[in-house]
Amino acid sequence: MTTTAPAFTPRTVGKALLMPSLAVRLLRSPRSPGSGTVLLAQAFSYAGDLALNGRTRGRFLAGLSSFLLAHLAYIAAFRRRSSVPVLADPGRRRFVVAGGTLSTAMALAAARTDRTLAAPVAVYSLTLTAMVASAAAVDHDQGRDRLLTGASLFLVSDTLIGVRKFLAGDRGRLLEAGVLTTYAAAQWCIVEGMRAGSRRRA
């Protein structure tokens, strides 16, 4: 999830091209479990990117909702590549607990800026935590390493967004650069994980 000013700059143009380019890359790969759902997640991500080109509360909530749907689609795709329950592993259970703590902290930070954002941010953060845990539960031969890297980078990117928006007053070029870099890398890794899994099944 990324936030930028509503202007045609190399950065905003790059964001607009990112998801369509990755969708084409995925479409050119052999069809595999979850690939159609990932394409749906990419569509929601693209809608979120466009919404977050503005800085109003309405645009932020629209972007948040789009990325929430994207993460739900990613969860569904990852579950199709897993043969174990998400919470079967103690490490994943500990991560979910830690993610819940981070979600609470982010919601409290959001409430300092705008109390109406607290609940949506909490729900979004919990969903993001579930997405990362689902990636960790993917079978190793189904692209788990790259999928987990992508999901983890998504968590880093969105945490940086929270820090920038709710703690740094929506300022900080280095933070914004970190958001954009980790976000692009996250989406790329997820596509490569899906492609790696499809090659192993071929």
Where do the model's predicted regions map?
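Short amphipathic, positively biased membrane-proximal segments
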Residues: 1-202
